[in-house]
């Protein structure tokens, strides 16, 4: 599939519009448009569009193609820490993480098999979207709006436990919004475009698996009664 981009038509007396630019695009790619620029495609497709007050600088390609750009390679971390993880960094906050930086919106394309349970703080954090592009059977997302309760294990009663985490099955084409403060954990093999606004702010991924583990231990929960816990975060806090 091809995309063609050009500046909007000029009014009389204005300089002529620049020549159109074109690029192949596919699932997982990001297209950056300048203010006043229009885009056309040679085939139907679904797009998720963000209008931002600022645009990435010219060092960022106007079409970012994670499976074709030699500067973008698998970088384990975040929600996919396995050494063989598929994790492509399209737009990110820090230059040491990926080649293209932007403090307005970040995009990582990730296959999530088993992430740690975490949230992003309301102050100094970020909002997150999962645009689901492929799933394995059984892929799901655990979420919780009771993050503050989980962070106080001594206050949790046995009857509170069933309401602490919710399990959401995922399907290709889903768009999941995870506002600041909502805890979440991906499981089972979901390939998602993970989009954050304003971006992956350092230190704003706060793990809570050690709190979930503490609740299980304190209440003597085991088997199906126990809260699901990511092993790496069970015994010590994770902050990324």
PLM regions and their residue ranges:
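Short, conserved beta-strand element in jelly-roll/cupin
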Residues: 1-18, 122-157, 197
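N-terminal accessory/assembly segment that mediates macromolecular interactions
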Residues: 1-66
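Short, flexible, glycine/charge-rich loop motifs used to bind or transfer phosphoryl groups or to couple energy/partner
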Residues: 21, 119-120, 166
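Conserved metal-binding segment of the jelly-roll/cupin
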Residues: 24-43, 52, 163-189, 195-197
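Extracellular structured ligand-interaction cores
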Residues: 28, 47, 102-104, 126, ...
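Double-stranded beta-helix
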Residues: 43-86, 187-240
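A short glycine-rich, His/Asp/Glu-containing loop-to-beta-strand
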Residues: 87-133, 140-144
């Amino acid at each position: 599939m091809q995309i063609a981009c050009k500046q909007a038509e000029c009014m009389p007396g204005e300089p002529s519009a620049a020549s159109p630019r074109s690029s192949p695009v596919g699932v997982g790619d990001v297209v950056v448009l300048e203010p006043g620029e229009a885009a056309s495609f040679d085939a139907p497709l679904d797009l998720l569009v963000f209008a931002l007050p600022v645009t990435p600088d010219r060092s960022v390609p106007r079409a970012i193609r994670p499976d074709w750009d030699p500067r973008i390679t698998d970088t384990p971390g975040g929600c996919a820490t396995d050494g063989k993880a598929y994790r492509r960094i399209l737009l990110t906050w820090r230059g040491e993480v990926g080649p293209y930086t932007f403090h307005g919106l970040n995009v990582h394309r990730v296959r999530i098999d088993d992430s740690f349970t975490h949230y992003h703080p309301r102050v100094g954090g970020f909002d997150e979207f999962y645009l689901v592009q492929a799933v394995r059977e059984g892929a799901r997302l655990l979420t919780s709006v009771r993050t503050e309760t989980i962070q106080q294990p001594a206050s949790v009663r046995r009857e509170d436990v069933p309401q602490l985490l919710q399990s959401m099955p995922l399907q290709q084409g889903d768009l999941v919004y995870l506002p600041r403060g909502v805890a979440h954990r991906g499981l089972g093999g979901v390939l998602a475009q993970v989009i954050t606004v304003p971006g992956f702010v350092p230190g704003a991924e706060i793990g809570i698996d050690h709190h979930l583990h503490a609740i299980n231990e304190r209440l003597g929960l085991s088997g199906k009664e126990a809260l699901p816990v990511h092993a790496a975060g069970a015994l010590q806090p994770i902050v990324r």
